[in-house]
Amino acid sequence: MYMFEYKAKTKWLPYYDEFPLVYVIKATPQEFYGANLHYLTPKKRVMVVQRLLEGRIDIPRTCVHKYLTSHIDGYLLDLASEEWDTAILLPIENFVRNVKGSVGKFPYTKELVWEETDETYYERIKARRVVRGYGKRKDTQMAK
């Protein structure tokens, strides 16, 4: 799981999180797909992380986004699985939107985001979690 600062390409996005907390599902050097857990309420984040630690991916589809590596501002903070329980409760989500014809970004409340995510909460991506050649031994063993 990673934390980072992100400046989205906003042409098609109604809003985005400037400080995502992302479980990466697929990656290439130019982009990656991942589940931003900030789109979920803290209580639902706990359930998602519990499943991840059990070796299961069970994530609402609306949390999954494409991130361009060229739009990351700074470094990716790689979080060990032992830190996930703490990281999901940090109140660092910052949703913003751009308004056509206006300069700057406008805040978009997390409560509105959570409400929208709740509407499609049961449309989920499910898979077995696989860790290859990375992480601690127990993470790799758990995923087998």
PLM regions: where:
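Intrinsically disordered, low-complexity, charged/polar segments
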Residues: L40-K144
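Short coil-to-beta transition motif at edge beta-strands of beta-rich domains
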Residues: M1-L13
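Intrinsically disordered, low-complexity segments enriched in small/polar residues
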Residues: Y2-F4, L21, E31, L37, ...
